[in-house]
């Protein structure tokens, strides 16, 4: 008997990782996560059921505040029974602050919450966004979360409350 496919919820709050270049203007615009597989075809190899939620208005992470942290936590709480793991896509400026706040807001979870961002948009040919997203999805799909607390991912796995920003 085969195990069921992991169900992962991506929560896009804002940040470069969720942007794509507008070919007409060359400016960045929010990525349409309905086309995630088209832009990151490697995700097919993961064999996960992936859904997403996008903030109605993506937040520049330098403007994120406790109300946004509550919104992220609420999305996780409302979807906790439906999914096996959660990936929060976030701007890198304040990702460490959000990760730390969520580690206290979401104590004692039995499912992984992974927070990641990137320096380059997800749709670029050579980007840390693709690697960070795929790594975050793989960790979120693990059946044995790391101490049940949120983690930040950017090539290195860090416990959320141990992260810091160089701002």
Task: Show which residues each predicted segment covers.
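N-terminal glycine-rich anion-binding loop in soluble enzyme alpha/beta folds
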Residues: 2-78
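Short, ordered loop/turn segments at secondary-structure junctions
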Residues: 13-15, 91-92, 118-121
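Short acidic/histidine-rich motifs immediately flanking catalytic phosphotransfer sites
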Residues: 82-84
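Short Gly/Thr/Asp-enriched flexible loops that form oxyanion-binding sites at enzyme active sites
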Residues: 89-111
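Proline/glycine-rich low-complexity loops and linkers
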Residues: 112-128
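Short, glycine-/small-residue-rich phosphate/pyrophosphate-handling segment
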Residues: 123-154
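Conserved small/polar residues in nucleotide/adenosyl-binding loops
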Residues: 156-163
